[in-house]
Amino acid sequence: MANIDNKEQTELDQQDMEDVEDVEEEETGEEANSKARQLTAQMMQNPQVLAALQERLDDLVGTPTGYIESLPKVVKRRVNALKNLQVKCAQIEAKFYEEVHELERKYAALYQPFFEKRSDIINASYEPTEEECEWKVDEEEDIAEDLKEKAKLEEEKKDEEKEDPKGIPEFWLTVFKNVDLLSDMVQEHDEPILKHLKDIKVKFSEAGQPMNFMLEFHFEPNEFFTNELLTKTYKMRSEPDESDPFSFDGPEIMGCTGCLIDWKKGKNVTLKTIKKKQKHKGRGTVRTVTKTVPNDSFFNFFSPPEVPENGELDDDAEAILTADFEIGHFLRERIIPRSVLYFTGEAIEDDDDDYDEEGEEADDEEGEEEADEDHDPDFDPKKAQNPAECKQQ
């Protein structure tokens, strides 16, 4: 009986020891995890480690997944067939955009009479009739106008005494100042010049010619330069790159050329003169040296960096051209067709509304994903990640 009791006690002691060992192992594991987290945090603060990690990630971009590499040879052949079909689709898409360009050229001619009349009104070459000036407003706006009518009576009397301004003064300057993309380019010393800007037009290449478009800036005679017309031409391409056909995503701007501005003496705002004092090391005499250096100005827009024959640009030139292409496209697609709405600010409000809606949709989607994660007991964060999408971003 004593042996049995001793045996049971021994088994109980062993179980207790196992429990103690398990607790000790768990405590040791937690300490190890804590140390690992601390070590990871220290490593991620090391610039050399981060640089090496970024280089490794860059190397992974565009590399095939392990699944693709593991496919049987016969399946890989079929995938290659699909890729060949994709190239043919890209070629058809290129033709589609070429025809879109032809449609733009055709309809540009239909828009032109309205744009010409717009220019005539802005520059006081034509006074619109009462019928042309009528504009139907919403009921709320109508009520607000009625309430303001009495307050405006005195101002109107004063306005009658003043000389009637011609056309719509500073129309294009106001448009530029209302649009962030353009206002960032306009310096204070540019504004007196842009007050003389009469019109901006877009001209498309003729049928059968390589795809391009020209922006025309028409100026009235002024004291700054002799040109009445400044131009910027953008060369486009709508065909897949043979070396990377899958990157095709519609027409792209390949380059641009500006024009020479004939500045009048002392009026070139793209240059500035600085004075620097120099002291002679031996004699100790001081002299003042003047030097001409580039100056920030909207009119640098007409002197873009030249793209070398090999197509390689330094980082600064590439950044300038990228911004230049964006501005040229924005002027062509948004500003010129809808300039009056940018003048009044209505188009800017519409753009802001579009961004707000996109932001709300994105927030909703994120909320739904988070809810799914919280309520799904089988949710695996690792499986939820999509490496391919991360690479594309």
Curated annotation (Swiss-Prot):
Biological process, per Gene Ontology: nucleosome assembly; positive regulation of transcription by RNA polymerase II; primitive hemopoiesis; spermatogenesis
Composition skew (Acidic residues), residue ranges: 11-30, 347-377
Keyword field: Cytoplasm, Developmental protein, Differentiation, Nucleus, Phosphoprotein, Spermatogenesis, Transcription, Transcription regulation
Motif Nuclear localization signal: positions: 274-280
Any one GO CC term of the record: cytoplasm
Compartment(s) of residence: Cytoplasm; Nucleus
Protein's UniProt name: Nucleosome assembly protein 1-like 1-B
Organism: Xenopus laevis
